[in-house]
């Protein structure tokens, strides 16, 4: 047995190449072999893979787009939107669908909760005639449908609402009081492993909506957690926490509420940024409220005390009056909105230039290191290198 092992180990040769030209040739040979085995594009340089700038789909909220750092949710990635009940999770997801459709993309909504309101979706700007909808019977079915759609390469955005509502086949077949510990977590773990590569290759944005639960017996720290195990937390490129704020009232009538979003995880830009916007009942994210708030943050609209002003215009006293002024003067609102878009585009471009500068400096440093290494005389002769055969541990005891 020891002789057979040694024979096998001797057949596998590992070359120690010191010459730079030989290294380059050896690498080209290795790449050619890998492409022959696994197909063209199995291995490539990162710069050749695709455009370095991450493509994004707007969320329908300017404030949230700015908080995400790239102007929306990234394409070809897994996204998680979670929060308490009635906080605006589905509203944000439907706005992402509407924005995808505006860009000419195909969308799908996997309604695990069986609670999608088509009238509300239409009010938010979703083209319900072209949106694909599925109401699966089990969690396995929901994830298989999502995988099949992503694998087709024809869908630009898939929304799964929600992870917490998924029920496994074993749970459906069992009795009401039966315990099924960790089944959803195992299902999600397997699904994430399969989905990640598929959505990346097809450039599909996969949005998972999730609820929150409380861990029992937590004395210190945040007792809240999300169902479905840890897999989704790891595989998601972006995690957005959505929470409901104070109510928006007109006299005694409640018209909507302030919604707070926090980017808890972000693999494409700096995380932990927060934003607030208005969600109006039956209408979705308030565009005029966002324009006003963003313009104030960027210094386009000036705020002095309770008064809001833009150039020579007095918008009004108080936020509600200023919003009404912008609604009554759509030309001024459009002008402010264009300035906001230009300003946010400049901010994203500046962030990109910063990253490019950093990578160029690294390249320069690496190139300099390569030149200094090449200029040094090779003091080591070939005789100084010995080929060490691996020691057979089994033979030591003989």
UniProtKB/Swiss-Prot annotation:
Positions of region (Disordered): 351-398
Domain of life per record: Bacteria
Pfam families in the cross-refs: RecA, RecA_C
GO CC terms, sorted: cytosol
Places the protein is found: Cytoplasm
GO aspect biological process, one term: SOS response
Keyword list, A-Z: ATP-binding, Cytoplasm, DNA damage, DNA recombination, DNA repair, DNA-binding, Nucleotide-binding, SOS response
InterPro entries in the record: AAA+_ATPase, DNA_recomb/repair_RecA, DNA_recomb/repair_RecA_CS, P-loop_NTPase, RecA-like_C, RecA-like_N, RecA_ATP-bd, RecA_C_sf
Residues where ATP binds: 83-90
Keyword DNA damage (UniProt): yes
Major localization class: cytoplasm
Residue ranges the record marks as coiled coil: none
GO MF annotation terms: ATP binding; ATP hydrolysis activity; ATP-dependent DNA damage sensor activity; damaged DNA binding; single-stranded DNA binding
Bias-annotated ranges (Basic and acidic residues): 354-365
Function: Can catalyze the hydrolysis of ATP in the presence of single-stranded DNA, the ATP-dependent uptake of single-stranded DNA by duplex DNA, and the ATP-dependent hybridization of homologous single-stranded DNAs. It interacts with LexA causing its activation and leading to its autocatalytic cleavage.
NCBIfam families assigned: tigrfam_recA
Similarity field: Belongs to the RecA family.
Protein name, per record: Protein RecA
Gene responsible for this protein: recA
